């Protein structure tokens, strides 16, 4: 890709394609869904945890917890996507078999949030600005808030990962990317109004108020405190339990992470 350019990929399949073709050097991606791709041999190195708590599990009012999803319809763009993987892990922790006990409704043409708002599905995993919209419209309620509820609040949801060969061959550039990402994360804490306006100006959301709410609700201040390796181990174990990865957590950690750049940036930025 040209220097300084960016692209948006909406699925794990496109992510894998982008890495394989050399179109992507770095991605900020949901932690859990990275691991099945790594387990299948995708050359990714995870270099930092970025933030915690960007997803919320919305459900109809009669569903009071994850266990109540048994036999209910749950929307996702596709099997193997981030929401499908996260909800599968949640379900397995309360004794459900996500492959058998949940009725997955997949749609590439209609967003799950729209199906939920129309009452066509019972639950879905929302990401900003979807939760902010649903709260404003008083649609459904949250049964899992990853910013507040354990164990999800104890682990990163989004992590910075790089093309393995790029990271190996370009340590100086990799460190610059890590530093830039974490300084931007700090800016979300120190200058939320400025960041919210830039999010709107760049077309990521038309609603300034939703952007402000997101910056207030998502914990962007945890990257100094949390050990990102804990996140990799947690999701590797959980995904192995539901059959989405074959490797054990120790092997995934050994093959996948490089915290040198994060540790250097922590010392430079304080933390």
Question: Residue ranges of each PLM-predicted region?
Answer:
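Pocket-lining segment of extracytoplasmic ligand-binding domains
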Residues: 32, 111-202
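A generic short alpha-helical patch detector that favors 3-5-residue windows
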Residues: 79, 151-154, 206, 227
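Secondary-structure end/capping motifs
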Residues: 168-247
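Conserved C-terminal helix/tail region of periplasmic/extracytoplasmic solute-binding proteins
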Residues: 240-271
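Short, glycine-/small- and polar/acidic-enriched structural segments
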Residues: 1-108, 115-118, 122-128, 139, ...
């Amino acid at each position: 890709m040209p220097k300084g350019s960016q692209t948006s990929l909406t699925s794990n399949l496109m992510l894998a394609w982008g890495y394989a073709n050399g179109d992507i050097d770095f991605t900020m991606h949901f932690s859990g869904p990275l691991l099945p791709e790594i387990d299948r041999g995708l050359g990714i190195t995870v270099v930092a945890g970025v933030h915690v708590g960007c997803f919320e599990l919305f459900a109809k009012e009669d569903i009071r917890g994850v266990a109540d999803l048994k036999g209910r319809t749950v929307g996702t763009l596709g099997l193997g996507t981030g929401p499908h993987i996260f909800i599968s892990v949640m379900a397995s922790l309360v004794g459900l078999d996500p492959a058998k006990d949940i009725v997955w409704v997949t749609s590439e043409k209609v967003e799950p949030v729209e199906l939920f708002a129309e009452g066509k599905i019972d639950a879905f995993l929302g990401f900003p600005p979807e939760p902010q919209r649903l709260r404003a419209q008083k649609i459904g309620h949250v049964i899992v808030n990853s910013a507040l509820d354990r164990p999800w609040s104890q682990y990163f949801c989004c992590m910075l990962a790089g093309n393995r060969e790029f990271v190996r061959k370009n340590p100086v550039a990799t460190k610059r990317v890590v530093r830039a990402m974490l300084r931007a994360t700090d800016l979300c804490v120190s200058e939320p109004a400025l960041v919210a306006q830039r999010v709107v100006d760049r077309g990521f959301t038309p609603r300034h108020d939703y952007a402000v709410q997101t910056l207030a609700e998502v914990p962007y201040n945890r990257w100094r405190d949390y050990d990102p390796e804990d996140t990799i181990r947690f999701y590797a174990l959980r995904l192995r339990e539901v059959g989405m990865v074959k490797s054990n957590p120790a092997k995934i950690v050994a093959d996948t992470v490089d915290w040198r750049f994060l540790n250097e940036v922590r010392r430079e930025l304080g933390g």
